[in-house]
Amino acid sequence: MTICSCEETINEFEMLTRDAARVQKDTLKKILEINASAEYLQNFGLGGRTDAESYKSCIPLCVHNDIEPYIQRIVDGDTSPVVTGEPITNLSLSSGTTHGKPKFIPFNDELLETTLQIYRTSYAFRNREYPIGQGKALQFVYGSKQVITKGGILATTATTNLYRRQRYKEGMKDIQSQCCSPDEVIFGPDFHQSLYCHLLCGLIYSEEVHSVFSTFAHSLVHAFQTFEEVWEDLCTDIRDGVLSKKVTAPSIREAVSKILKPNPELADSIYKKCIGLSNWYGVIPALWPNAKYVYGIMTGSMEPYLKKLRHYAGNLPLISADYGASEGWVGSNIDPTVPPEQVTYAVLPQVGYFEFIPLEKPIGEETENSASIHYIESDPVGLTEVEVGKIYEVVITNFAGLYRYRLGDVVKIARFHNSTPELQFICRRSLVLSINIDKNTEKDLQLAVEEASKFLEGEKLEVMDFTSFVERSSDPGRYVIFWELSGDASDEVLSSCANALDLAFIDAGYTGSRKIKTIGPLELRILRKGTFKEILDHFLSLGGAVSQFKTPRFVNPSNSKVLQILSRNVTQSYFSTAYGF
């Protein structure tokens, strides 16, 4: 993409957002026209109408369970217009990391186009601040296994649905985001071999790399933790021009061997830089001197990885990628200079039809920083009707058969850009920890871990990763928090951490229940190093893609395999005494 076309993209964005209400009206009309024959819409009596008033009065708000019977028919091979006018030929699989069961979500060419619109917009603003010109991107991206459903529909992750399309590849060329690695590495049969070769290809093209990317911050941190373990092997491969025997997949070996040539000078340079680093601080700019930034989704459940990612990135800016889900895109990051913790997303009014359910916390019940699930809901409002400073749940209508679909995301309106809102992601609304009247979300858990981990700072330790579980086999039930640490901590410190975790859950339902002993003392369980990598491997064995993996912050009892992995890796256990028992 030239600077000129970046300007054109920004100008188009400015034009569309100046008249967001009209664009929303036109977008809904377009969606309803092309899907007028859909059984789902007809069942609710829409009758071909395309205006917002008729649409909202006929079609109810929904969650995935409501539309699952329709999608299951598509999975089973029903080619009639079930949720869209044209038959659905591809399905995306959501991650399924919490419950162990992925969801099927319809995918079509229109969703591909909205993806490219989102990417082009954020790239244009990014390139204005950090121009990259010609070059390559070190991308830790991975395809996943494709499955054919009973009805002959191709199902895979949303990212793989993109990577396998020629139109997507062309779009990535336009925005200077070509991956260093050949397709055979991206679609390799073994994640560990693909990761190794991503690192290798990145080093081979180290002078040409202008950006470092993965879908999620977790994948970036995992990549460089792996680099710490294999960097000497990578140097040997580059010095000798021979790919390590640990890469056994023929497709990967053949593709990477074509670009791997003996280069002792480069190997020596990498070796000297690595041994000169202090605890791997700034490894990314040291080895990729022309990289302008590190890019990926860094909000929500990815925030706990930012500290480690900043360590690897040194002085390079971290830029949070765009806001969306497998169900569809919402907004672009148009201010890449803002740190991830403060990032906002401008909603693109042409990529879907958006509504927002106003959420209010009961007066006096919640503290300012609590992300509790307690909310009073009002009727949904339109994109241009939201108010700055207020919080909402996002509702999306997309081009692929989701109508008034509740995403379950809580957002705050930070400001308006022209007439479209800029959203700040607050948390997933879904409940994580609950025993009786207590209600805590993923954000509450994250805040509790941040607070309790301060006790580790004196021993220069950090929480590498964490998750949680509700233990109901005892009476009363209790919260169980699992930590994987960077090293060994004393019993005294970990006991303090357990108490701090217990006290950090400030939801009134929790504190009241603890005081009257209807919830038992919180338990902190310490895990062996490598436990979360084992959970990742389990996820991959189910056909998931690492670029889609999110550590489950809460493990549902139905996810027995992950619970088994956690249980057999517990090395120490500490019960809170914060409430005196």
Swiss-Prot record:
Cellular component, GO annotation: cytoplasm
UniProt induction comment: At low level by auxin. Induced by methyl jasmonate (MeJA), red light, far-red light and blue light. Induced by wounding and infection by the rice blast fungus Magnaporthe oryzae. Induced by elicitors from oral secretions of armyworm caterpillars (Spodoptera mauritia).
Entry superkingdom: Eukaryota
Binding site for an L-alpha-amino acid: T159, T160, N161, L162, Y163, E534, I535, L536, D537, H538
Organism the protein comes from: Oryza sativa subsp. japonica (Rice)
Protein name stated in the entry: Jasmonoyl--L-amino acid synthetase GH3.5
Catalytic activities: a jasmonate + an L-alpha-amino acid + ATP = a jasmonyl-L-amino acid + AMP + diphosphate + H(+)
Short name of one Pfam family: GH3
Taxonomy of the source species: Eukaryota, Viridiplantae, Streptophyta, Embryophyta, Tracheophyta
Function comment: Catalyzes the synthesis of jasmonate-amino acid conjugates by adenylation. Catalyzes the conjugation of jasmonate (JA) to Ile when expressed in a heterologous system (E.coli). Catalyzes in vitro the conjugation of jasmonate (JA) to Ile, Phe, Cys, Leu, Met, Ala, Val and Trp. Involved in the production of JA-Ile in response to infection by the rice blast fungus Magnaporthe oryzae. Required for the accumulation of the flavonoid phytoalexin sakuranetin in response to infection by the rice blast fungus. Involved in herbivory-induced JA-Ile accumulation.
GO annotation (BP), single: defense response
